[in-house]
Amino acid sequence: DIVITSNGGYPLDQNMYQTVKGLSSGEACVNDGGVIIIASSCVDGHGGEFFYHLLADYENVEEAYKNICDVDPSKTEFDQWEAQVLLRILVKAKVIVVSEDCDPKLFTDMHMMHANTLSEALNMARSIVGNKKITIIPDGIAVIVK
């Protein structure tokens, strides 16, 4: 299936770190192997070097997730929790970020996909999962999905 959401606009969509909050509602709705599309400007980039490198420094999502989950709870680092949430989402589903304001390489470095438009993102999602059910969450950061 496909979930489409947003982070509610600026300042909540200013960077990828903040965007994870909106992705969480999509995670609650998407089936394993599905696609979450999130519209988020990310005009300020990733939101923190440490956060970025917790994903970008690994070959794949599974390796990054295992590494972060293996950290002793008494030794966790600042921003680790948000990277762990994003990695948990990426283990479950593909993520496509719709943004015209950020270098697409930032998203691909962090194991996500990029689209310039919602139409482009939908075409990408359909090429991954087919013509599946679409769930729309207009303001993903402001809902609790059950």
Locate each region found by the language model:
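Glycine-rich phosphate/diphosphate-binding loops and the adjacent beta-loop-alpha structural elements
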Residues: 1-18
